[in-house]
C-alpha cells in the first residue's frame, strides 16, 4: 500500500462515501471537522475499505460547503462524545488545503478529490 502511494503521488482520486459522524473541534481561529465515513466506493482502492476518518480545516473550505457541514453536524443523531465502534480496516487521512470537497445536501453523501501528496499522515489500524 505504501509503495503504491509513493508511485502515484500526484494522481487525483475520487471517493464517494457516506458521513456517519461529524465532530467539530474548535481551534484558536479555526474549526477542524473530523468526519467518520462509511460505504466508501472508489476505483482507486484495492481491497476493502470499510471506514475512513477525515480531518478537514474549515478555513480551507468554500462557504457553501462549510454551511452544509455545519448543518449536518447539528442534525446528526450521534452524541459528540460517543465512540463509534468499527469492524475491519480503518484508514485515517488528514488533509491540508487544496482538496476539492463536494457535499450532497440531501443524503449525507460526500464526494471529494484529493492529490496523494496532500496526505500528511496515513495510518492503518485494525479494529
Where do the model's predicted regions map?
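Cysteine-centric segments in proteins
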Residues: 2-9, 13, 20, 71-75, ...
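Structural detector for short beta-strands of small beta-barrel domains
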Residues: 5-43
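OB-fold and OB-like beta-barrel modules that bind single-stranded nucleic acids
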Residues: 15-19, 83-91
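Short acidic, gly/pro-rich beta-turn/loop elements at beta-sheet edges
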Residues: 27, 47, 96-98
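OB-fold/S1-family single-stranded nucleic acid-binding modules
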Residues: 38-42, 89-127
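Polybasic, proline/glycine-rich intrinsically disordered low-complexity segments
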Residues: 45-46, 51, 83, 123-127
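Conserved binding-pocket/active-site segment within a compact domain
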Residues: 46, 78-87, 101, 108
